[in-house]
């Protein structure tokens, strides 16, 4: 299992939408924003497959009644893996986690290190040639 420390950058507070089929979110889980009124906590849902998440779950779980922490996706952000990856693999959202992207799917970020299902690793930017 990958062991990494995470520096909390830009952590925000969020609750799960009442329509969520899960009871809480985990660290590095991809999340989609449902609403943000600018005056309180953000409301989120687990991200659908093959979509680009707005946030990832932080170290404090988001629940329907209790706000937890979320982070924007940035280099170094914690991401939860749903399968085996190697450093530099492009990642997509599938089954509520990040997995190695398949042809024709939306890659969100790259893996900053090797890891397996259930590991929390750091996100890395996708290299682009200008």
Which residue ranges define each predicted feature?
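Surface-exposed, low-hydrophobicity beta-strand/loop segments enriched in small/polar/acidic residues
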Residues: 1-130
């Amino acid at each position: 299992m990958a062991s990494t420390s995470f520096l909390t950058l830009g952590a925000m507070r969020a609750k799960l939408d009442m329509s969520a089929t899960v009871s809480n979110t985990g660290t590095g889980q991809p999340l989609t924003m449902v609403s943000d009124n600018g005056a309180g906590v953000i409301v989120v849902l687990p991200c659908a497959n093959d979509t680009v998440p707005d946030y990832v779950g932080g170290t404090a779980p988001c629940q329907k009644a209790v706000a937890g922490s979320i982070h924007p996706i940035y280099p170094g952000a914690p991401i939860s893996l749903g399968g085996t990856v190697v450093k530099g693999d492009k990642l997509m959202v599938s089954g509520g986690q990040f997995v190695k992207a398949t042809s024709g799917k939306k890659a969100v970020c790259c893996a900053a290190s090797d890891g397996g299902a259930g590991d929390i690793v750091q996100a890395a930017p996708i290299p682009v040639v200008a």
